[in-house]
Swiss-Prot record:
Subcellular localization, as worded in the UniProt entry: Cell membrane
GO terms for cellular component: plasma membrane
GO biological process: phosphate ion transmembrane transport
Membrane topology per record: Peripheral membrane protein
EC number: 7.3.2.1
Gene responsible for this protein: pstB
Main function: Part of the ABC transporter complex PstSACB involved in phosphate import. Responsible for energy coupling to the transport system.
Signal peptide, first to last residue: none
Reactions catalysed, as given in the entry: phosphate(out) + ATP + H2O = ADP + 2 phosphate(in) + H(+)
SUPFAM superfamilies recorded: P-loop containing nucleoside triphosphate hydrolases
Gene Ontology molecular function: any one: ATPase-coupled phosphate ion transmembrane transporter activity
Pfam families tied to this protein: ABC_tran (PF00005)
Catalytic EC class: translocase
Protein name (record): Phosphate import ATP-binding protein PstB
Organism encoding this protein: Methanocaldococcus jannaschii (strain ATCC 43067 / DSM 2661 / JAL-1 / JCM 10045 / NBRC 100440)
Length: 252
């Protein structure tokens, strides 16, 4: 039986007066890739940001309902948000390495969390870059500025930076939309590999990508979760007309 790692219960979100999410109930299974699909503005990125409370940073956002991580509501008053974001990491749409060396990018999180020992940091940096399939390309130039890397390399560096603090869940918001096809393929292969160790939730506009890499797919429309299921079922035998229309390209 696949374990539920995270789960949302009756999750509603407002930006000021405008409601953006409506009663979202969604399980996220451990060591699986869950893809969130739907047309622009349907709420999938807003939903993703609820999973590590990044919406807290936006003024006038109000949230009702629960987001459970291992059964505990991450919106409870006693939750340390920094600790939460260590457990639930994020990779953004546009590669956003810090303007510092490749090494310092990866060591950034571990240092914040108190690791000072050079040997230990060296180990973490090598481990994370290997996990992100970047080590062989950069091992001889770790002190080079990260901004000099190609777009695809920068995104793999951002993945290495995210996993360096050993998160349990990795959120990815359209991680390949700014990349060329070859870099995209590398990131997709990497996601499948990382799912052996992490629970991954990915927002994607690319339907082929969702069908290639994910185990489960959730289809959002106008702030509502229309359908959720195993990816193969959603793509080959959707139960809802709206899902079928979107997947077959009749709208979106």
């Amino acid at each position: 039986m696949t374990k539920v790692k995270m789960e949302t219960k009756n999750l509603n979100l407002w930006y000021g007066e405008k409601q953006a999410l409506f009663d979202i109930n969604l399980p996220i299974y451990e060591n699986k890739i869950t893809a969130l699909i739907g047309p622009s503005g349907c709420g999938k990125s807003t939903f993703l940001r609820c999973l590590n409370r990044l919406n807290d940073l936006i003024p006038n956002v109000r949230i009702e309902g629960e987001v459970l991580l291992d059964g505990k509501n991450i919106y409870d008053k006693d939750v340390d948000v920094y600790e939460l974001r260590k457990r639930v990491g994020m990779v953004f749409q546009k590669p956003n390495p810090f303007a510092m060396s490749i090494y310092d990018n990866v060591a950034f999180g571990p240092r914040i969390h108190g690791i000072k020992d050079k040997k230990e940091l060296d180990k973490i940096v090598e481990w994370a870059l290997k996990k992100a399939a970047l080590w062989d390309e950069v091992k001889d130039e770790l002190h080079k500025n990260a901004l000099s890397l190609s777009g695809g390399q920068q995104q793999r560096l951002c993945i290495a930076r995210a996993i360096a603090v050993k998160p349990e869940v990795l959120l990815m918001d359209e991680p390949t939309s700014a990349l060329d096809p070859i870099s995209t393929l590398k990131i997709e292969e990497l996601m499948v590999e990382l799912a052996k160790d992490y629970t991954i939730v990915v927002v994607t506009h690319n339907m082929q990508q969702a069908s290639r890499v994910s185990d489960y797919t959730a289809f959002f429309l106008m702030g509502k979760l229309i359908e959720f299921g195993e990816t193969e079922q959603i793509f080959l035998n959707p139960q809802k007309k709206e899902t079928d229309d979107y997947i077959s390209g009749r709208f979106g």
